[in-house]
Amino acid sequence: MDRETLAARIDHTVLGPTTTRADVLSVVDDAEAHGMNVCIPPCYVADARDHASADRTIATVIGFPHGTQATSVKVAAAEHAHADGADELDLVIPIGRLKGGDHEAVTAEIAAVNDATPLPVKVIIETPVLTDAEKHAACEAAADADAAMVKTATGFTDGGATVPDVSLMSEYLPVKASGGVGTYADAAAMFDAGAVRIGASSGVDIVASFAE
């Protein structure tokens, strides 16, 4: 893997509750300088799209960070993000429904959001709060709903991406590893486990720590 390929597999991320427009535009500038994608709050998608080059991939989040919104609200948010210029959607599943055993509802929600726009949907399953059986069920729901990827975590619960979780998830769909990936060594471990994308607020550091 060369530096350009690495950068193209990173979603440089800013999603904190105090994120400002200036923060988002700074992340876009970093992404432009290094060849990364960005993942940003939905309220700034239009600003980022206006600021970024036409070929810069902009992802945003739906149902973030806890996944507790009604499905109709998530569908509307997906449609709004698409209209504002988003290229990809990172969707948080209804975690409580999964843990309560209502797997059909989880699948139906993912499918509803997936069908609402032509954008690829990366399904955030929040691995730190799931048992292995629940991780399998969440990934199966995402696969059954024709999602594009599964993603480990939001970063809003304790824990993040782990090699065993990425390996498990990659049995079902391509994996975005997010949470605690701060260096190239971290990213390489995730890629070796089966991840195809990294989500990180430290995207610049990951690229900078790469040695060809």
Swiss-Prot record:
Enzyme Commission numbers on file: 4.1.2.4
InterPro entries the UniProt entry points to: Aldolase_TIM, DeoC, DeoC/FbaB/LacD_aldolase, DeoC_typeI
Pathway: Carbohydrate degradation; 2-deoxy-D-ribose 1-phosphate degradation; D-glyceraldehyde 3-phosphate and acetaldehyde from 2-deoxy-alpha-D-ribose 1-phosphate: step 2/2
Subcellular location: Cytoplasm
Cystine pairs: none
Active site positions, chain numbering: D90, K151, K176
Gene Ontology CC: cytoplasm
Catalytic activity: 2-deoxy-D-ribose 5-phosphate = D-glyceraldehyde 3-phosphate + acetaldehyde
Pfam families: DeoC
A molecular function (GO) term: deoxyribose-phosphate aldolase activity
Alphabetic keyword roster: Cytoplasm, Lyase, Schiff base
Entry keyword Lyase: yes
A GO BP annotation: deoxyribonucleotide catabolic process
Signal sequence, start to end: none
Domain of life: Archaea
UniProt enzyme class: lyase
Predominant localisation class: cytoplasm
Function, as annotated: Catalyzes a reversible aldol reaction between acetaldehyde and D-glyceraldehyde 3-phosphate to generate 2-deoxy-D-ribose 5-phosphate.
NCBIfam families in alphabetical order: deoC
HAMAP family named among the record's database cross-references: DeoC_type1
UniProt family annotation: Belongs to the DeoC/FbaB aldolase family. DeoC type 1 subfamily.
PANTHER family: DEOXYRIBOSE-PHOSPHATE ALDOLASE
Protein name: Deoxyribose-phosphate aldolase
Gene this chain is encoded by: deoC
